[in-house]
Amino acid sequence: MAVLNQLPVLGMIKEFRRSWRALCSSERTTLCGPDSMLLALQLSMAENNKQHRGEFTVCLSDVLLTWKYFLHEKLNLPIENMKVVEHYEDIKKTYDDFLKNSNTLDLIDVYKKCSSLTSNYENNMISPIQLRDFLSGTEYAVSDEANPHMPESPVKCSQNDEQVRVLVKKIFFSYLSLLVNSKNDLALASILNIPDRGLGREAFTNLKHAAREKQLSMFLMATSFIRTLELGGKGYAPSPSDPLWAHVKGLSEFINFIDKLDEILGKIPNPSLAGSRILSAIKMQLIKGHSSGEPFYKAVEEVVQDLNLRIKNIINSQEGVAVSANNISPVPPKSFAINHDTAYCGRDAVKILLVLLDEDAASAPTRNKAELLYNDESTVPHSGPSVLTLFRSPTQEKNTSVKPLRERIHKSLQTEKNKMWQTLIRSQFACTYKDDCIMSKNKWHVNSSSKPLSALHLEDDVSEGAQSSVGKARIEASSENAHVGRWKGDKLPRKSTQRQISKGKQLDLDSENLHCDRGNELYQHKNIKIPKVPSGSHSKAGGKLAQGTKGNRCPARGKLIPGQTKLTQFFML
């Protein structure tokens, strides 16, 4: 639907392009239409909320309220009785910085720059109120009241087809905008993963962080990374810890495709043919993997035909203006102007694309603001996540040493779960395993019964030589047919590596004995007396202790681990 003030806006943009040298620093500066302005304001508000509240988000009501105040304040219109959100000045500064870094201007900036020109333009200038009505979309209401409502179509698929067509049109203009202005991050966000290149939200976030660190646009950062890999060699390769390594394939495909479009733009001098080739290349990239009967495929075909026709109309209108200018041939370029910034191959094609993009910037704003700002992937296929979702980092900054409470609780529960699962996996000799529940209780509830444990542990350390001899005697008693000279009186088996058990394990085994047999064995451990052995008489002490084990089995049995007697009787059968 055509808006009443669309033609004055187009006239303002044309005047800006004619005097671009005096108004901006680059010929390739692109313009933000109403929708792009609203998206940039939403991102600025979300960034401000992240700085003050810690969350990169903003509700729709706050965006619309700020949008209304923003239009009046920037156009110097009265703002009485109008609400404004907190930190508005910070939001406005973030908005201006975003446009400046993207090499873009909004329509209000264009209006202010054009108002500083000669008085010849002031006669045809659009008024601030008209520009406000155009940007806010109030002209829709006037048009709807003047015309009766059209009956809605009973076919629901027609509405979905229209949404797909609007999406495809946005994709084409984003590709063309990025081709003309490589600093436009808003355009890159719309096409980075369309078609699917495996560059989802994580890849976009990594690219955004890398671009901010080096103070580059996202497209230039991706180009620098890929060029370094292709041309730099091993000495100039990025760091192995660079997160962009995980997205090399997708970034390479994207950069190579933009290079292909740029090559078409520079090699073909005819702007009409160059524009047609560029649109055809984008079309082949989008319809890959789609059948001709799908709505997306049909929408791509329709948009390409429409854009080709518009390019031809732009060229014809420019040629007609040049011929009708009093039949005077244009002034030949001066020598100093031949190589002045914009003298490059394909400049005519770039001018045509700029006019096409300016017409899109002067198009009517989207009526459904919620769909524009918070689009749903499930309702419109191939749309991808919203711009706000893309610019929101999926992971938190790793600048804190303390992990979040939720992560710590989850890790603790996972450890307990693994511990319980390990206790279930037991062999047929389950009696030889320690009880984890008892061990955990003994670990946290230390009482007076812990004293015998330390006493036993100290006694074990003091009588290390004696215990080694006792161990040898028990090993000899466990196997009668191995060697000559073994003891035959004691048949209790014990491994030769018994003394190599760590002190921690010995403490756990003793504590378990004390826990299981509180009535009798606890006092047996207290009454165990191990004779003191001189350091130089190991053999004698060993013989005496060996005899002691033959005569009295109760103290020796008190040092066995739980279940060892059952295991010994099992092997004796």
Swiss-Prot record:
Can you name one GO molecular function term for this protein?
A: DNA binding
**Is Nucleus one of the keywords?**
yes
Q: In which tissues is it expressed?
A: Expressed in the ovary, Sertoli cells of the testis and in granular cells within the cerebellum.
Would the keyword ATP-binding turn up in this protein's UniProt record? no
* Source taxon at top rank: Eukaryota
Q: Which UniProt keywords apply?
A: Cytoplasm, DNA damage, DNA repair, DNA-binding, Nucleus
The segment annotated Disordered runs over 470-505, 531-560
For this chain's UniProt record, which GO biological process terms are given? DNA repair; negative regulation of double-strand break repair via homologous recombination
Q: GO terms for CC? A: chromatin; cytoplasm; nucleus
Query: Where is the protein found, in the record's own terms?
Result: Cytoplasm; Nucleus
Q: Which family does it belong to?
A: Belongs to the PARI family.
User: Assembly and interactions?
Assistant: Interacts with RAD51 and PCNA. Interacts with PARP1. Interacts with TASOR.
| Biological function | Required to suppress inappropriate homologous recombination, thereby playing a central role DNA repair and in the maintenance of genomic stability. Antagonizes homologous recombination by interfering with the formation of the RAD51-DNA homologous recombination structure. Binds single-strand DNA and poly(A) homopolymers. Positively regulate the poly(ADP-ribosyl)ation activity of PARP1; however such function may be indirect.
Q: What is this protein called?
A: PCNA-interacting partner
Q: Which organism is it from?
A: Mus musculus
Q: Gene of origin?
A: Parpbp
